[in-house]
Amino acid sequence: MINNKNVIEMGLRRINQVIFSIFLLIGGCVAPPDYSDGLLENVPAIVDETDYFSLSLLGDDYSEDKEWELSLMTDSTDTILTTLVLADLSISNTDSSILFMMNDSGDTVFQPILLGNVVWSSDIAVNLIGSPKKISFKGDNFTGRLEYQILKK
């Protein structure tokens, strides 16, 4: 009778341990943050195709230099649509983030200094600036949203 009682107590302890472990595992789980726009903070999102390039950045004191070689295929008869949207910027006097677009000759053909909220777009003939080949972002405490696109028309 004593052995049966010990076996039952050991079984109940084992069941309690399993139940406690399950509650601990379920209760300890943390869901990932809910990003409504899909952007992760300080992680540039890039889409690079033969007819389209997009750079999206949600920066919070972002201070890195990044370069992207473009897959964009253009010839001298093409026109490109370039758009830049800057929003929710928080800039101090010492911040100096810059975006560059370089052509196939290595010349800088677009260089906005990112100082304030802006919505800008322009059609540019490739024969005037050369074929875009590289995008460079020099981040210096960039805080805000940057959306930059190049679309071959």
Describe the residue ranges of each PLM region:
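C-terminal interaction-tip segments
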Residues: 80, 141-153
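Short, surface-exposed beta-strand/strand-loop-strand elements in extracellular ectodomains
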Residues: 92-109, 147-152
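N-terminal secretory signal peptides that target proteins for export/translocation
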Residues: 1-12
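Noncatalytic modules at the cell exterior or secretory-pathway interfaces
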Residues: 82, 126-140
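Bacterial signal peptide processing site
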Residues: 30-32
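Beta-sandwich interaction modules
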Residues: 71-76, 113-129, 149-152
